[in-house]
Amino acid sequence: MPGVEVVVVAPAENQSGTSDRTTAGTVRHRPGTTASGVAGTAVEGFPADAVAVALDELGVLPDLVVSGVNEGQNVANFAPLSGTIGAARAALRRGIPALAASAGLGPQANFTAGATLVAEWITAHRGELLGGTAQTATVTSFNVPGCTVGTPKAVIEVPRAPAVPANVNVFVTANCDLVPATAPTNDVEALMGGYLAVTPIPAEL
């Protein structure tokens, strides 16, 4: 993206399910490289620690914090447990706009779709971000369906479901080309219908 500077600060190890947990005391960090070869800072702590290290130790002054793209969708009752969303919530508490993006698991993980969603959102909201008027009341959470057939449908904004039904596997959408009989009313229904779900998540859950 032209005119955009990306600073990578992330946990050194997988910290799935750690919510907005933070480490007491000093958090160690060191130079690191992502799996795709991008230089950044590896934080020996939780995702929310990475936000604190970026702001307080490295002196980063971001217009936006982007957390993800995570492997595994974070919808319904999974959202409060998510380290990806937890880092974004930590940014909100510091007055910084934040996005969280999550995709599927294994072969169904469409990271490209997640990254594209983030890039399109940044482009659409660039003026607000640079002007300091972007909202900081909620995290904008993106979830990409794990399509085994077809490709994700349009972006749809929906609220968070209370819980994932016991018989539903949100990590896999069998056929994203099928059109649901009714419009989705929450993030779980959106994923299972093959839609790219956008959901507002408050800082406190």
Regions found by a protein language model. Give the residues of each.
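Charged helix-capping and loop-helix junction motifs
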Residues: 80-86
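Extracytoplasmic/secreted cell-surface and envelope-processing proteins
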Residues: 16-18, 74-78, 108-111, 151
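Alpha-helix C-terminal capping segments
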Residues: 54-60, 86-97
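A cross-family phosphate/adenosyl-ligand binding-site feature
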Residues: 2-50, 60-61
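Electrostatically charged, flexible surface regions
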Residues: 113-205
